[in-house]
């Protein structure tokens, strides 16, 4: 049994006492006006002091978080180094930067379209946020659903800010993405007749969440990684891209690489480049914990920005409502939304529900922050404060064995610390989860401002608008990974690479100097900084 405090145990008894009553009395959904109010008053995206305006680059004048601004306007790692661009160490038709779900999908598809592909990844293939995804992947492939309904759910959930051409691509290609994954060997949950089981997510009007228990991302990544390796695609691991190389015509034409183990600098020349570097959770914006993997440090945004790529919605992040608040050993780890879709309710220290559990993620997160901070109704934890996620309700609704069958990974994670989520509620608080914004692309997955630079996955801005619905990120890495891979392979057939240059890096440095910026922070950051500053 986990060593809960006396205060936590007393609060837990109140949760148990109200459970039966709450089972038949769902908390009402918010009106549009109530949602706007709770967001503006409580969501981290609305804390003006956390932001600054960029002074140089394609997005000069736009606001971004301080941590990201320091990297976008940071010091290039290639300055002062002699780099031989005339004798590249690697040459390919398509260079894929990143080894997660988007990068793997892109590499597989580019290879299938006849391109010579090289994948570089600063960690290992599969060390990515894809592995951390739990709940599932959306696709409107049931008789009562359609891509049009999926579009409306996602467009509204993203505050009507998504780029229509990108969102349309996401929802219309979703059913084929599920089929592609299934054909590759992904083992989705099915009923006894072989039909895929689907569930709701926050903000969905239909059950369209396809899952692999509660380790959907790991199962998808396992399958994609195997396909990359089975195809014999060259993977250069523990090697980071630290600068995009352009040719004399201003087109993306490769990358400067850094061996993470030896420090060796190398050059990769390519006809097209695909950035699939994922998110930025390990920058710990505003001091938040994160559900992200160790390498999520916004590298792709930095590389693209210095090369002249415009960003879109870089000021907006997703804070997943339910990160672990206790035990401290897994502080910030993801508690999948599927827990709530199966019936678990969010309740305060007195056992009272305070929000409909499947509101959109930003609204739910803001409601939890309000309950804990402004209202003072949270439960004290080792690292701060949290609210209860009443997991025993799942088996009251679905019957004994539901938790072990539907969310076994979640059950095991808490069992490691002596918490049986079938009998005991768990403490949660929002955790930094997803980069809503990213690099601005067109309908062909190419940067709107840099030719031959393609982007897929979490590094893209505009697919989800200003908030993402559950299950649409695992979907976008497949849809846009495949499309970027195909588009890059086709584009490579038309490209003749000019003389390689890094002149854009020197030009960016001059703009920083002219703006009075003396960057001290090396960028891209590559790895999180957890060194103590007070030693």
Q: What positions do the PLM features span?
A:
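Extreme N-terminal leader/targeting segments of oxidoreductases
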Residues: 1-93
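An anion/pyrophosphate-binding glycine-rich loop and adjacent beta-alpha core
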Residues: 1-21, 25, 309-420, 487-493
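Glycine- and aromatic-enriched mobile tails/lids
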Residues: 1-3, 76-77, 82-93, 101, ...
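Helix-rich C-terminal "cap"/substrate-channel and partner-interaction subdomain
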Residues: 17, 21, 41-60, 379-413, ...
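Conserved redox-cofactor binding core of oxidoreductases
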Residues: 46-65, 71, 183-264, 269, ...
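Short hydrophobic core segments
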Residues: 94-97, 267-278, 455
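Glycine-rich active-site loop/strand segments that organize a redox cofactor
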Residues: 139-170
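Glycine-rich loop(s) and the adjacent beta-strand/alpha-helix scaffold that form part
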Residues: 272-329, 333, 471-487
């Amino acid at each position: 049994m986990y060593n809960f405090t006396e205060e936590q145990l007393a609060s837990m008894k109140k949760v148990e006492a109200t459970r039966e009553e709450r089972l038949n009395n769902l908390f009402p959904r918010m009106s549009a006006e109530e949602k706007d109010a709770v967001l503006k008053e409580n969501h981290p995206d609305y804390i003006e002091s956390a932001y600054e305006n960029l002074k140089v680059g394609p997005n000069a004048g736009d606001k971004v978080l301080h941590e990201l601004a320091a990297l976008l306007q940071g010091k290039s790692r290639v300055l002062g180094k002699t780099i031989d661009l005339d004798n590249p160490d690697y040459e390919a038709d398509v260079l894929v930067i990143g080894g997660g779900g988007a990068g793997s999908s892109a590499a597989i598809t580019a290879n299938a379209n006849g391109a010579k592909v090289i994948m570089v990844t600063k960690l290992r293939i599969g060390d990515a946020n894809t592995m951390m995804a739990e709940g599932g992947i959306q696709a409107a492939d049931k008789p009562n659903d359609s891509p049009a309904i999926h579009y409306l759910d996602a467009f509204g959930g993203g505050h009507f800010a998504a780029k229509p051409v990108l969102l349309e691509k996401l929802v219309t290609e979703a059913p084929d993405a599920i089929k592609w994954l299934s054909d590759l060997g992904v083992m989705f949950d099915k009923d006894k007749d072989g039909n895929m089981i689907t569930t709701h997510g926050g903000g969905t009007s239909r059950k369209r969440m396809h899952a692999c228990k509660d380790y959907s991302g790991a199962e998808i990544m396992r399958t994609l990684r195997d396909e990359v390796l089975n195809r014999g695609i060259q993977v250069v691991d523990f090697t980071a891209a630290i600068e995009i190389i352009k040719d004399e015509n201003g087109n993306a034409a490769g990358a400067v690489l850094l061996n993470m183990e030896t420090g060796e600098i190398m050059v990769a020349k390519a006809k097209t480049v695909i950035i699939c570097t994922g998110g930025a959770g390990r920058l710990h914006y505003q001091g938040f914990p994160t559900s992200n993997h160790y390498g999520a440090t916004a590298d792709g945004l930095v590389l693209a920005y210095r090369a002249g790529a415009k960003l879109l919605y870089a000021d907006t992040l997703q804070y997943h409502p339910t990160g672990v608040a206790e035990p401290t050993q897994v502080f910030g780890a993801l508690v999948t939304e599927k827990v709530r879709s199966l019936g678990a309710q969010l309740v305060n220290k007195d056992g009272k529900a305070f929000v409909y559990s499947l509101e959109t993620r930003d609204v739910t997160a803001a409601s939890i922050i309000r309950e804990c901070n402004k209202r003072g109704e949270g439960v004290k934890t080792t690292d701060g404060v949290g609210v209860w996620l009443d997991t025993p309700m799942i088996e009251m609704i679905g019957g004994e064995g539901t938790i072990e069958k539907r969310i076994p990974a979640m059950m095991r994670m808490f069992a490691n610390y002596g918490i049986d989520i079938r009998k005991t509620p768990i403490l949660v608080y929002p955790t930094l989860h997803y980069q809503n914004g990213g690099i601005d692309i067109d309908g062909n997955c190419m940067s709107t401002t840099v030719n031959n630079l393609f982007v897929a996955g979490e590094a893209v801005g505009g697919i989800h608008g200003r908030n993402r619905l559950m299950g649409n990120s695992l979907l976008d890495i497949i849809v846009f990974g495949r499309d970027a891979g195909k588009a890059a392979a086709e584009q490579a057939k038309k490209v003749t690479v000019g003389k390689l240059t890094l002149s854009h890096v020197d030009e960016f440095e001059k703009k920083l100097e002219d703006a009075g910026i003396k960057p001290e922070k090396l960028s891209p950051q590559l790895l999180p900084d957890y060194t103590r500053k007070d030693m």
